[in-house]
């Protein structure tokens, strides 16, 4: 079965053209970390994800999420490269050269987001532009989601979509995972999403502020210690539990299902140790 286009229109965040695409209906998801979950991608509909990333146009789908990194000119990037240790300097200079060869004027640096936009988001964008997906209403799509596991925002923030797009899917899914940074700029929308969504917190102080609204949070912490091969979070609060997937490789999101906001009445919020390509930049958030 073809992937489904659930929304194709202006971003609620800034009015730019975006599209929401439900994937995984025909083939099992290969993401070992999440398990076989249906995935909802939210991307710019008018430009390649890499272009959006390096120009800041991804704000249409990610809002003010600090994980996006920052946009600088190539000249500024060269100045920054000159101040870095040898390995990091070489890596940034290589990226600057690639950007220049592509005709870019700007580049994204210090990105903490784990999503590699040149992979799945780009594949999905190209297929969308080739007309390989069909349109469906959220209510129609809910028929295929019912009883299955759903990962909303495999890329992009569901706060970029009008109310009523993801809600019907979340209501019938057996397991839901979703995260939003919209509490940084639109708390009213964040509270709506909190019924099945974790509010992304960038530090413990922020998480505690969100808890007062009744929401659950997902927080990434740079304060961790490696114990017996496991990154154990040091600043975990009494109202938090460490993400099980970060403790045991045998656990996947589909097995766990804790990141579903208030959907099942789970009390504790979730914290995970920083990891991946952007971990080095997370401590500065």
Which residue ranges define each predicted feature?
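Class I S-adenosyl-L-methionine
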Residues: 1-285
